[in-house]
Amino acid sequence: MKASKLAAVVCAAALSVGTTTSTLAETARVAVSQIVEHPALDAARNGLLDGLIAKGYTQGENLDFKYQTAQGNPAIAVQIARQYVGEQPDVLVGIATPSAQALAAATRDVPVIFTAVTDPVGAKLVKNMDAPSGNVTGLSDLSPVAQHVALAKELLPNLSSIGVVYNPGEANAVTLVELLKEAAEQHGIKVIEGTALKSADVQSAAQVVATQSDVIYAPTDNTVASAIDGLVAAANAADTPVIGGSTSYIPNGAVAALGFDYYSVGVQTADYVAAVLEGKPISSLPAKVAEGSDLAVNRAAAEKLGLEVPASLLDRASRIVD
């Protein structure tokens, strides 16, 4: 474990309300539903488990931590939600918007904690971030889309068009594209859209978009994230750089990315789960945007495209891949 991640776990444990010995003597049942497996969401899940471990929970002893993935299929997410609710765990955790929505729709009684959800209000998970009134609260990973556009502009000063591939069936993706359009308009930049309803469609959509755009923006869309290699391959074939909304896209060939450390997001989510296990009501746990973001640069990917990364970006980057 990296030192920064270990520090995040320790810090989260120190800041959280101490878990009582009597509470830890019982087995806490936590059921996690994740829409699809990809590096960012997997990191969030790992951070969640490590965060709980740092608070004194041990899998197989005083913690029953269950996990299922919907393999990118919202219908499977609904099935998982129904199964979990029937098992009556102490806390349900939905990783990403579709899984969180499925859990929230399946119960009004079992506490639901969401994480890695772009727009909790738009997704109808909560009506008010500051004052959740039902059985649902958690963490948003709303991307700083305006900063992503500024990042693309810094990399390509003469930028006139940004391409984006997304799944219109994901509420989070629709929100991000709307924010992208607003930010791009302020810079006089045209947005070229390509849609992909499933992972298998991402590369073909990217092939079309890449030939019409100066850069491709890869949002924190779960469909795109699960097929990021195909998107980057299509972009590279057209000599079009990729800017990522998640730093998890950097190893796949994104030239630059600004986004959350999803492991840290998971650790922060553990605070919510532990609070519920300690008996705190959902109404006392405001939903909020996760803390912390990183700028990462893939200089090797840039060089393959004949791009020189500005020193201003390199100086600010917390991670550089050569």
State each model region's role.
Residues K2-C11, G18-T19, L24-D322:
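Short hydrophobic alpha-helices and adjacent helix-cap/hinge residues
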